[in-house]
Amino acid sequence: MTARVSADLPRTLLVMAGGTGGHIFPALSVARLLAARGWQVVWLGNASGMEGQLVPKHGFPLESVRFGGVRGKGLVTKFLLPLNLLRAFWQSLGVVRRVRPNVVLGMGGYITFPGGMMSVLLGAPLVLHEQNSIAGLANRVLARVADRVLCAFPGALPGAEWVGNPIRADLAALPSPQARYAERSGPLRVLVVGGSLGAAALNDVVPRALALLPADTRPIVIHQAGAKQIDTLRANYAAVGIDETHAQAVPFIDDMAAAYAQADLVICRAGAMTVSEVAAAGVAALFVPFPHAVDDHQTTNARFLSERGAALLVPQPSLGPASLADTLASLTRAQLADMAAKAREQARPEAAERVADICVAAARA
């Protein structure tokens, strides 16, 4: 089998991405762009994974392959890995044969490995994109056989082109940090982002840190905690006597672009998409990397901005109410505006367009 290149046939992109939103949402950004250019888009993923819910809602057909990770799983799962991998290879082979893609885009997740290997076997051009600063095992292997290798952080894979992470257009369209910060006065505005599952460490420490600050200089906080932790977070604020005039606890934020735009400082984890969004929005950040992330990749993600003067990095074991209160008290809006400008300098707002263009070029090669 070879990829179709005839002008008489509609061109087809096979997207491989699954497991987490950090893989799926960037892939959706690229898929929408190519669909708007007239391409057919088919998704290879696991119907029981997050992609099984998200991808069909965005109008793309999902071809399901049963395969998942083994890290942190029991001995039975690890023992069955060879059998499960063989099944995934066979199922992926069938998908690639049926779809006959002009180009295959791997955006991460365990499903990328069997799909990528079978694409190469059948002669379909493979474009690989690594979202994190430390590449996962599947991408490290596939990078050796891919036609094009792209990365969101410089140096994540040998010889990869740094294109950034595809992010939502509304973030890149925000006014410059200089314009936003210049008109502000009064207490700092702090956005705390815990993600859909919340971040227990932030939910515990931030309320106690704010309580240590004088009420007249205390930052105004919007604290997103996730539905499962919102009641605990509100109780934490109530326990230290902080009401909604100083801290608004919310389970979700519908308009993240607006939330980033109004903030002087974001306190958050350091997942790949979060770091990329902070840079695209042009906002100062205090990163508290999740300490149990695979290969501690969140710390390396955060260093991309902290080493360039665009963010602060605080390891979770070092995060305490007193130290956080001291940090918040010492920061000025002028310092944060400078950090925000440096963050915006590292953004790659054209990432989705660049990945889409590379897919088109690879299909025509």
From Swiss-Prot:
It is a peripheral membrane protein. InterPro entries: GlcNAc_MurG, Glyco_trans_28_C, GlycoTrans_28_N. Pathway: Cell wall biogenesis; peptidoglycan biosynthesis. It comes from the Bacteria. UDP-N-acetyl-alpha-D-glucosamine binds at residues 20-22, 132, 168, 196, 253, 298. One of its GO terms (biological process) is regulation of cell shape. GO terms for molecular function: UDP-N-acetyl-D-glucosamine:N-acetylmuramoyl-L-alanyl-D-glutamyl-meso-2,6-diaminopimelyl-D-alanyl-D-alanine-diphosphoundecaprenol 4-beta-N-acetylglucosaminlytransferase activity; undecaprenyldiphospho-muramoylpentapeptide beta-N-acetylglucosaminyltransferase activity. Its EC number is 2.4.1.227. It catalyses: di-trans,octa-cis-undecaprenyl diphospho-N-acetyl-alpha-D-muramoyl-L-alanyl-D-glutamyl-meso-2,6-diaminopimeloyl-D-alanyl-D-alanine + UDP-N-acetyl-alpha-D-glucosamine = di-trans,octa-cis-undecaprenyl diphospho-[N-acetyl-alpha-D-glucosaminyl-(1->4)]-N-acetyl-alpha-D-muramoyl-L-alanyl-D-glutamyl-meso-2,6-diaminopimeloyl-D-alanyl-D-alanine + UDP + H(+). It is found in: Cell inner membrane. One of its GO terms (cellular component) is plasma membrane. Its main location: membrane. Keywords: Cell cycle, Cell division, Cell inner membrane, Cell membrane, Cell shape, Cell wall biogenesis/degradation, Glycosyltransferase, Membrane, Peptidoglycan synthesis, Transferase. Belongs to the glycosyltransferase 28 family. MurG subfamily. Cell wall formation. Catalyzes the transfer of a GlcNAc subunit on undecaprenyl-pyrophosphoryl-MurNAc-pentapeptide (lipid intermediate I) to form undecaprenyl-pyrophosphoryl-MurNAc-(pentapeptide)GlcNAc (lipid intermediate II). This is UDP-N-acetylglucosamine--N-acetylmuramyl-(pentapeptide) pyrophosphoryl-undecaprenol N-acetylglucosamine transferase. It comes from Ralstonia nicotianae (strain ATCC BAA-1114 / GMI1000). The gene is murG.
